[in-house]
Amino acid sequence: VIPEGYTQENVAVRGKATQSAQLRGEHAANSEASNAIDGNRDSNFYHGSCTHSSGQANPWWRVDLLQVYTITSVTITNRGDCCGERISGAEINIGQHLASNGVNNPECSVIGSMATGETKTFHCPAPMIGRYVVTYLPTSESLHLCEVEVNVDKPAAA
């Protein structure tokens, strides 16, 4: 719930994204970490607006917001052309540390399941302070995200 007199802003679009390992080969350009913060919720991987890890164990994706924010929720758009079940069990962690690539930062939420192509908002139990937002998948599945929006409450313009 957005407090009265406030509006919500996605600060991820100004950040810098990276991931554990990028898919290689003919679809490498479609797989870049920055695709998930381009402001485009297109969920078809082949349209070039999603990210895709290579098939290594425990893949992660991270956005550096370039400054510290108080984060209320994270909105994720799941891949829509196939494989939507792969995201099940992914963790959303938020914090100020890069140790272990940020996967040990405090947990905002766990993605139980998402439909293929679904956009869903995950609310942190309380506002969280952090610079790094990490989506970590503790399996050997590929991690693909079509959009990640990091939501902060800002005072509304008068």
From Swiss-Prot:
CC per GO annotation: extracellular region
Chain residues that bind Ca(2+): N35, D38, N40, S49, C146, E147
GO molecular function: calcium ion binding; carbohydrate binding; fucose binding
Similarity annotation: Belongs to the fucolectin family.
Keywords: Calcium, Disulfide bond, Lectin, Metal-binding, Secreted
Protein name in the entry: Fucolectin
InterPro entries xrefs: BG_Antigen-Binding_Lectin (IPR051941), FTP1 (IPR006585), Galactose-bd-like_sf (IPR008979)
Protein residues bound to alpha-L-fucose: H52, R79, R86
Other facts: Binds 1 calcium ion per monomer.
Subcellular location: Secreted
Keyword Signal among record annotations: no
Annotated SUPFAM superfamilies: Galactose-binding domain-like (SSF49785)
